[in-house]
């Protein structure tokens, strides 16, 4: 949520910042700005409402420099206006600041320290930059003023600060919001996500909470707030720079939908040996085997992936498994079992709702595993154990390949745990074969995109609402399919347990209401079919998606074969593609839906 970038050294700062901001746009895109300084007495501050493209159009060749900071915003405090866009500048025009996070005591700080300062924005960030300037006016150096300010602020932040009087130095600080330093040759960069600076360097230092960093072109000095020096290791981020490009696809979302078969195969290759045996870290296996109950904690799409994973852990490994929304769990923790193990599912690894749970359960002494796509992320670093989704960067705001990768990895872990415990159910489940069926089945469905486009047109072109129904994992996938449609096409969509419709919600069914029914569970297929009939009898336009062995000739889509427990790996491809085409046909920006951001770093 919000992306920040910075650069200092021998680079064309404007271009480095702009390109970085374009790649961070997934974190927020309601306004953007940058400040550059040529270290020879000239500087520029440019801010615009709207996308990075709008900012870019506002720049000409005079806006150049060798150091600077940039920001793309997802509004928290104050509407998306030019005044509220970052960088914020102190009234004496000495300090320039970009911020990702939320300062929770901004109002109190303003009342206590800034009574005589006129604020020009509604943001918490402006309070911080004015406070730094006010402290500097008392004779403190920029660094000490920043240090003292950090001692006063409460909340989350990744800050990058420029002191116009000393443009050979860039200051950054971090608490609860992600921030990395990228190491270059006579330059250094700052970024919320390594992805944004991969064209500059592949060597990154992930900062930790409480770090205050002083950067010059050739030095990186990291201290804690009390001035104690700390050394943080640099990691090489192995990512093909091209992974972050759209290539021939019109939208990242379509590219990422199309990548799913490859992601399935890559996951199998990553977590199995030549004999097809699952290989997970021994320490993780020991931890998992202590669990008398697993608690999967996640948000949004990742929560939906957890709902699909829970029955796998129960059936294959015999471990009772609960799935919880992170935003609820942290503040209303249920009574835990005697030996809980926590699994955090997260595409970004930065979700604040999840992190607050991680911090709490770690303090309670419970073992933790993070499954995420971003190896350098906070949740990956802070949990006891970490497994990568290895899905490659997911840029579109609507999550697709991370969801299917999460389910596939849950299946691999559940199988490994069941096998380690000698369970027959695990022995009978050939997960490697099933994931290979998933990959080929996904490919088949992707090749039927035209059919799904036509279905999307027929069902959703003009509708204001829609329903997705199913039972068991079909209910879980209904929630995810509805979320996909909602977030990128703004259709009011509901995922519903098929059997619950008749208990009230069926009252919403009218002539032509679109209802997609998922039928992959042999146990309940007949019941779900009856529920689909019931809505059709009340005028609904029903689209049935049925498993290979349950399909009837008049079902609109028949799935390729797969174990019913993994059917969401196929059914969701239909959901994703229908949502994609609906958004496209309605003329929306598929990758950047309104009001959203990909990395949700505020509670
Ligand atoms: C929807 C989507 C979100 C995220 C949610 C949690 O397409 O991506 O619902 O799943 O914000 O984010 P992560 O998975 O990064 O923890």
Model-identified regions with their sequence ranges:
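Structural motif
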Residues: 67, 95, 293-295, 341, ...
């Amino acid at each position: 949520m919000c992306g920040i970038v910075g650069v200092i050294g021998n680079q064309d700062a404007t271009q480095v910042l702009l390109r970085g901001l374009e790649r961070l746009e997934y974190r927020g895109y309601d306004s953007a700005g940058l400040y550059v300084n040529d270290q020879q007495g000239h500087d520029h501050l440019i801010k615009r409402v709207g996308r990075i493209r709008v900012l870019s159009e506002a720049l000409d060749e005079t806006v150049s420099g060798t150091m600077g900071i940039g920001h793309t915003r997802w509004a928290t405090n104050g509407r998306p206006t030019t005044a509220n866009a970052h960088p914020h500048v102190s009234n004496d025009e000495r300090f320039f600041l970009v911020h990702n996070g939320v300062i929770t005591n901004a109002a109190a700080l303003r009342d206590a320290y800034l009574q005589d300062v006129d604020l020009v924005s509604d943001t918490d960030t402006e309070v911080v930059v004015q406070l730094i300037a006010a402290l500097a006016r008392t004779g403190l150096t920029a660094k000490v003023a920043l240090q003292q300010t950090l001692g006063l602020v409460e909340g989350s932040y990744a800050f990058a600060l420029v002191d116009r009087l000393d443009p050979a130095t860039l200051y950054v600080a971090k608490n609860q919001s992600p921030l990395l330093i990228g190491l270059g040759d006579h330059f250094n960069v700052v970024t919320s996500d390594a992805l944004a600076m991969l064209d500059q360097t592949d060597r990154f230092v992930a900062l930790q909470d409480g770090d205050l960093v002083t950067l010059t072109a050739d030095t990186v000095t990291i201290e804690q707030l009390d001035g104690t020096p700390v050394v943080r290791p640099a990691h090489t981020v192995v990512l093909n720079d091209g992974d972050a490009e759209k290539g021939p696809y019109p939208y990242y979302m379509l590219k990422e939908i199309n990548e799913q078969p490859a992601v399935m195969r890559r996951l199998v290759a990553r977590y199995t040996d030549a004999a097809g045996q699952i290989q997970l870290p021994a320490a993780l296996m020991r931890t998992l085997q202590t669990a008398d109950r697993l608690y999967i904690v996640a948000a949004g799409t990742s929560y939906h992936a957890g709902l699909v994973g829970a029955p796998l852990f129960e059936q294959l490994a015999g471990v009772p498994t609960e799935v919880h929304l992170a935003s609820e769990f942290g503040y209303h923790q249920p009574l835990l079992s005697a030996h809980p193990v926590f699994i955090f599912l997260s595409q970004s690894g930065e979700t604040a709702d999840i992190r607050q749970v991680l911090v709490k359960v770690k303090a309670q002494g419970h073992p933790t595993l993070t499954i995420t796509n971003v190896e350098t992320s906070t949740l990956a670093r802070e949990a006891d154990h970490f497994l990568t989704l290895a899905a490659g960067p997911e840029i579109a705001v609507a999550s697709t390949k991370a969801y299917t990768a999460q389910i596939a990895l849950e299946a691999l872990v559940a199988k490994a745990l069941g096998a380690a415990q000698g369970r027959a159910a695990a022995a009978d489940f050939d997960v490697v074969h099933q994931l290979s069926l998933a990959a080929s089945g996904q490919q088949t469905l992707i090749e039927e995109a035209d059919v799904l486009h036509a279905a999307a047109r027929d069902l959703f072109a003009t509708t204001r609402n829609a329903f997705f129904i199913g039972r068991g994992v079909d209910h879980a996938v209904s929630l995810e399919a509805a979320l996909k449609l909602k977030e990128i096409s703004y259709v009011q969509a509901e995922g519903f347990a098929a059997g619950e419709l008749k208990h009230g919600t069926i009252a919403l069914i009218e002539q032509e209401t679109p209802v997609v029914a998922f039928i992959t569970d042999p146990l309940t297929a007949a019941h779900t079919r009856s529920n689909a009939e019931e809505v059709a009898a009340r005028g609904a336009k029903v689209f049935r998606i049925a498993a290979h062995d349950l399909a009837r000739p008049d079902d609109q889509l028949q799935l390729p074969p797969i174990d019913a427990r993994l059917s969401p790996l196929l059914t969701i491809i239909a959901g994703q593609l229908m949502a994609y085409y609906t958004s496209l046909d309605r003329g929306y920006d598929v990758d950047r839906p309104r009001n959203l951001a990909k990395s949700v770093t505020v509670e």
